[in-house]
């Protein structure tokens, strides 16, 4: 009774799924791309070679550390990910990186498929990275759990197409490149979905996106992602800025079209929000300079920072601004709640399943700069009420930890027959 789980990355939700299977006593292996291994001579040599071109490969490898399952259960097929990193270092607009990503992900899938055998009791797969493996597993009579972190791709692409049609200045060569290839990628995801025994989604928002595309929502089970360990309650409640200081909002993650960044810029410009509020943006900027510049007063682009530093900024900020147009969950929300930070988000965020408006955050319309401005002004005028949300925000994270996610996922996999002999 053993399950093989595979994904080219070591993302937190992937590792937590692997840990759930391991804790249930059914993990045969977790197959991934690059896995940080300080004992590896190859990795040490690669790090040294990268220094010659002033590239901190060691930092990239440390971000790919597997922490949730024993090392002897982890298998690594790293060449594709190394190639993607190398190309990404030289790529100016993302198209070459996207090309390499697609082809190396398919190669990874084929390698995993080739290693399947009848001694397994099931396979845990992820979207777009698993068609060959799912096909092989079903031929062997193995049940397959298929994890879809994001909403159905036709739905997502329609949102992006609408935004670039309404705001042509948002379009980039990367957007045009990926849009031209999306039909075949959608077909691949649909084939994976239909062949799977059970589909795992992180939110009701994601589950609802499937039926309009002709995909059966009856096979979908919703298992929300867990929150990180919570800060001490007194530290969380006492966080934020004093009332005499400017309101400080935080943005975590890519500053992009899909996340609604262009609406934030418009809200700051037209509403002159920078007079009394700051927005600290932590993450890469994926909007064209012609959209971002000149940067509105009050918005500060801080770039990417180490996780510990970001978590402290969650604690010392007044609210998280997460006006996404389409997000299967949005782990930035649970990260924020774990530090007592109220969340301002939309009904197009899967994490809104856990949001109680006026209690642990605020719910706004997606794609509406006026709604963003109105809610920022509400925060400015109601600092006491906003601060009072911190205790409820902390309680939200404490009530649904990763252990709760793993427990629910284990139940789903058992019901789907992946743990049967």
Spans of features found by a protein language model:
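Acceptor-binding helix/loop patch of EC 2.4 sugar-transfer enzymes
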Residues: 46, 77-100, 140-187
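Short alpha-helical donor nucleotide-sugar binding micro-motif in glycosyltransferases
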Residues: 193, 312-317
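Conserved donor-binding/catalytic core segment of Leloir-type glycosyltransferases
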Residues: 236, 240-259, 265-269, 280
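Nucleotide-activated donor-binding/catalytic signature segment of Leloir-type glycosyltransferases, i.e.
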Residues: 289-311
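Aromatic "clamp/platform" in nucleotide-sugar-dependent glycosyltransferases that forms part
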Residues: 325
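Short hydrophobic beta-strand element within catalytic cores of glycosyltransferases
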Residues: 342-345
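Conserved acidic donor-binding segment of nucleotide-sugar-dependent glycosyltransferases
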Residues: 357-358, 362-368, 378-383
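A short, well-ordered alpha-helix in the C-terminal region of glycosyltransferases
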Residues: 385-399
């Amino acid at each position: 009774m053993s399950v093989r789980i595979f994904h080219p990355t070591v993302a937190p939700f992937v590792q937590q799924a692997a840990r759930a299977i391991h804790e249930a006593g059914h993990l045969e292996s977790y197959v991934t791309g690059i896995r940080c291994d300080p004992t590896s001579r190859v990795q040490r040599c690669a790090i040294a070679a990268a220094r010659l071109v002033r590239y901190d490969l060691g930092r990239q490898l440390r971000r790919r550390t597997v922490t949730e399952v024993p090392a002897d259960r982890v298998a690594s097929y790293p060449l594709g990910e190394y190639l993607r990193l190398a190309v990404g270092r030289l790529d100016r607009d993302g198209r070459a990186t996207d090309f390499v990503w697609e082809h190396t992900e398919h190669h990874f899938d084929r390698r995993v498929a080739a290693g399947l055998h009848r001694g397994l009791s099931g396979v845990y797969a992820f979207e777009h990275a698993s068609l060959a493996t799912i096909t092989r597993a079903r031929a062997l009579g193995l049940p397959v759990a298929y994890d879809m972190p994001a909403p159905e791709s036709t739905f997502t692409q329609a949102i992006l197409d609408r935004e670039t049609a309404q705001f042509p200045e948002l379009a980039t060569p990367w957007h045009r490149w990926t849009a031209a290839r999306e039909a075949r990628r959608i077909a691949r995801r649909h084939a994976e979905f239909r062949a799977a025994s059970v589909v795992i989604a992180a939110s009701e928002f994601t589950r609802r996106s499937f039926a309009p595309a002709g995909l059966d929502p009856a096979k979908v089970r919703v298992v929300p992602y867990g929150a990180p360990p919570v800060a001490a309650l007194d530290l969380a409640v006492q966080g934020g800025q004093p009332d005499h200081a400017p309101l400080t909002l935080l943005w975590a993650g890519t500053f992009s079209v899909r996340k609604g960044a262009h609406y934030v810029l418009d809200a700051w410009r037209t509403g002159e929000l920078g007079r009394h509020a700051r927005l600290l943006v932590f993450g890469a900027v994926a909007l064209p300079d012609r959209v971002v510049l000149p940067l509105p007063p009050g918005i500060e682009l801080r770039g990417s920072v180490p996780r510990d530093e970001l978590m402290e900024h969650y604690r010392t900020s007044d609210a998280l601004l997460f006006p996404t147009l389409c997000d299967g969950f949005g782990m930035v929300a649970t990260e924020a709640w774990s530090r007592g930070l109220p969340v301002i988000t939309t009904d197009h965020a899967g994490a809104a399943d856990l949001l109680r408006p006026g209690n642990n955050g605020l719910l706004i319309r997606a794609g509406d700069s006026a709604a963003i401005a109105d809610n920022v002004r509400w925060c400015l005028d109601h600092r006491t009420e906003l601060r009072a949300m911190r205790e409820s925000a902390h309680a939200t994270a404490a009530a649904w930890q990763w252990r709760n996610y793993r427990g629910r996922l284990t139940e789903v996999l058992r019901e789907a027959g992946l743990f049967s002999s």
